[in-house]
Regions:
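Cell-envelope/ECM-targeting effectors and their regulatory/trafficking segments
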Residues: 46-52, 94-97, 111, 120-122, ...
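Surface-exposed loops/turns
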Residues: 15, 37, 64, 85, ...
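Short acidic beta-strand-loop surface patches of small beta-rich interaction domains
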Residues: 1-9, 56-64, 104-114
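Ser/Thr-rich low-complexity repeats and stalk/linker segments
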Residues: 134-136, 141-233
């Protein structure tokens, strides 16, 4: 929680202020959020561009999703990005493939955050791409990947089946459709971990990892999560 203009009193905080716990990432791709007065699971989900069902699913200790209280710690699917020299919100959004509006909304109201000015060392909360039923926690958006890259996340899927592919920016299928299985099937959320073997060399410097399920009725893609990545040369 680096403090700077317009916040000048480092020892002063106020009710309702949003702070990030120093232990920002307890598990890869999950950041601790401290509930403040007036919060609901839905409002937290909206702020971080995710879904209340998913938040409940990645917080198994949450006995009643309709009842959360100030001071409670919840995991949210997000990473902490430290601004470096030359960064702007636009360049960060473009590099990570995360909409600028999503980044701005997640950080609005934090100490010294301004959508017009950021400086080296400031830490931004970056929501990870997710749908109601899938969150990809590794790799992060903007990661440089190669064949064998680890893929890890959380999903609520029929019979626990999750599928994935990798495309480059020219539409070439770098890693064809493969499946993996979650640790629990729907209606529960389960963890999945697998790798992304390349079937052919990318023809461009960047592309997308797709993670999704297929409809049991017609086989169509559902809950598609698209994650921007770069390819190792």
């Amino acid at each position: 929680n680096r403090l700077g203009p317009p916040v000048t009193e480092h020892g002063m905080i106020f009710p309702g202020q949003l702070l990030v716990i120093p232990r920002v990432v307890t598990q890869r791709g999950r950041t601790i959020y401290v509930v403040k007065p007036g919060d609901t699971l839905y409002s937290i989900a909206v702020r971080y561009s995710t879904h209340a069902d998913l938040l409940a699913g990645i917080n198994p200790g949450l006995q009643n999703p309709s009842l959360i209280y100030p001071g409670q710690q919840l995991l949210i699917p997000a990473l902490i990005y430290e601004v470096t020299s030359g960064d702007s919100l636009y360049s960060i959004a473009n590099r990570l493939g995360v909409p600028l509006t999503v980044i701005t909304q997640a950080n609005q109201g934090r100490p010294a955050f301004s959508s017009n000015l950021i400086w080296p060392g400031y830490r931004l909360i970056i929501p990870l791409p997710s749908t109601q039923n899938i969150a990809v926690l590794d790799p992060y958006p903007g990661t440089v990947i190669r064949s064998g890259q680890r893929l890890h996340g959380t999903a609520r899927a029929f019979e626990g089946n999750v599928l994935h592919q990798v495309f480059d920016s020219n539409g070439v299928v770098v890693s064809g459709e493969r499946s993996t299985t979650t640790s629990a099937g729907a209606p529960s959320y389960g963890e999945f971990t697998t790798t992304l073997p390349f079937d052919r060399e990318p023809t461009s410097s960047f592309g997308n990892v797709w993670v999704y399920t297929r409809s049991a009725k017609d086989g169509s893609m559902q809950d598609v999560v698209r994650l921007k990545v770069y390819f190792s040369r």
